[in-house]
A protein has these predicted regions:
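Catalytic cores of the polymerase beta-like nucleotidyltransferase superfamily
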Residues: 1-147
Length: 147
């Protein structure tokens, strides 16, 4: 199976559009995880994740059923498919996790806010959020100090 090529500039532009569209629909939306780390270190992110106050059904309503995959909806995660060459963006609802029964998946999730979401993440660096429209970093866990 051939590799799917993704233009880094197109991927970044699409990740910004995802944030803009979620906000236009009345939801909080920020970049999260590795893309924030890479941006702060001056690197080109390999992919983009967005954390949002929108619930999975609301994310699907914003982007449409044909442009979304609900493979992680039980955990608040929807994949939004970009235009050709732009890749995809994982959009996760801010959440806190119940206990992990298998080491990988929580027994349940509770949708919450950005601060609570940052506290559940595995590394402080992954708890950083970035507003791509203003450049503002939201650091609830002192993750920037660990860069």
């Amino acid at each position: 199976m051939p590799a799917i090529s993704c233009d880094p500039a197109a991927a970044r532009a699409f990740a910004i559009v995802v944030v803009e569209r979620l906000r236009a629909a009345g939801h909080e939306a920020l970049w999260a995880g590795g893309c924030v780390r890479d941006e702060l270190l001056g690197r080109t992110p390999a992919d983009y994740d967005v954390a949002t106050s929108a619930r999975p059904d609301q994310v699907r309503a914003v982007f449409g059923q044909r442009r979304t995959l609900a493979v992680g909806a039980a955990f608040g995660v929807i994949t939004v498919l970009g235009p050709r060459g732009a890749g995809q963006v994982e959009v996760a609802t801010f959440r806190s996790d119940a206990a992990y029964t298998d080491g990988r998946h929580p027994a349940g999730v509770t949708f919450t806010d950005a601060r609570e979401d940052a506290l559940r993440r595995d590394f402080t660096i992954n708890g950083l959020f970035l507003d791509p429209l203003t450049g503002t970093v939201h650091d609830y866990v002192d993750g920037r100090a660990d860069l």
